[in-house]
């Protein structure tokens, strides 16, 4: 297969060549959901954990990779889609961080159409909101592989299992957890014993 492309950069007299990827080793994943659900924070964590960045950017500090526009820094929300690439086990993943505000719905629609899969982000505090529902519906309408990530489970008043049940109602009975947050595993075991 033909490599995706080669980019070079001159740094202090040295020529640096970016890693080449064949088309089968590239994935485009849209992050979608309601405003303030945690999409940009999730993108920052993925970039940091993959080694693409050496620091974890914070929205409040105005130093995230995806929200670099002065208006985004001022508002502390994404107003346009941004691409954040990283390598994971030899696969190039292009994250498309889409805005969550309805004013910028075109960015969400474009990001989902451009991606091959969608990661809908749902806040562990707010639950399944209208923005998450719309993102899920857009992903289904465009026949995209879809996963849901529940963010902010570590915050007070977050209820992972309530949100899981709500997702089954709003997204369909095929919703099934792949990973349960560590802080919730003991709660579910306790609830199960209490219900016997």
Q: What label would you give each PLM region?
A:
Residues 3-17:
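Short, Lys/Arg-enriched N-terminal segments with co-localized hydrophobic residues
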Residues 13, 194-196:
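N-terminal cationic leader/targeting segments used for protein routing and processing
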Residues 17-122, 126-128, 162, 171, ...:
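P-loop NTPase switch module centered on the Walker A-proximal segment
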Residues 46, 114, 134-138, 142, ...:
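Short alpha-helical scaffold segments that flank and stabilize functional sites
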Residues 124-174:
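Conserved C-terminal guanine-recognition region of P-loop GTPase G domains, centered on the G4
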Residues 179-181:
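P-loop NTPase motor core
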Residues 185-192:
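Conserved small/polar residues in nucleotide/adenosyl-binding loops
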């Amino acid at each position: 297969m033909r490599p995706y492309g080669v980019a070079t950069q001159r740094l202090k007299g040295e020529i640096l060549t970016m890693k080449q990827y064949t088309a089968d080793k590239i994935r485009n994943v849209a992050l979608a959901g309601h405003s303030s659900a945690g999409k940009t924070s999730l993108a920052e964590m993925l970039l940091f954990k993959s080694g693409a960045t050496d620091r974890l950017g914070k929205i409040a500090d105005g130093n995230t990779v995806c929200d670099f526009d002065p208006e985004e820094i001022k508002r502390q929300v994404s107003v346009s889609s941004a691409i954040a690439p990283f390598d994971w086990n030899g696969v190039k993943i292009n994250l498309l961080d889409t805005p969550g505000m309805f004013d910028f719905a075109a960015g969400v629609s474009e990001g989902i159409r451009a991606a091959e899969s969608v990661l809908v982000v749902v806040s562990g505090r707010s639950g399944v909101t209208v923005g998450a529902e719309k993102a899920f519906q857009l992903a289904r309408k465009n026949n995209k592989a879809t996963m849901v990530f529940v963010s902010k489970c570590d915050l007070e008043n977050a209820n992972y299992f309530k949100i899981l049940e709500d997702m089954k109602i709003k997204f369909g009975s095929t919703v099934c957890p792949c990973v349960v947050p560590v802080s919730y595993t003991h709660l579910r075991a306790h609830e199960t014993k209490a219900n016997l």
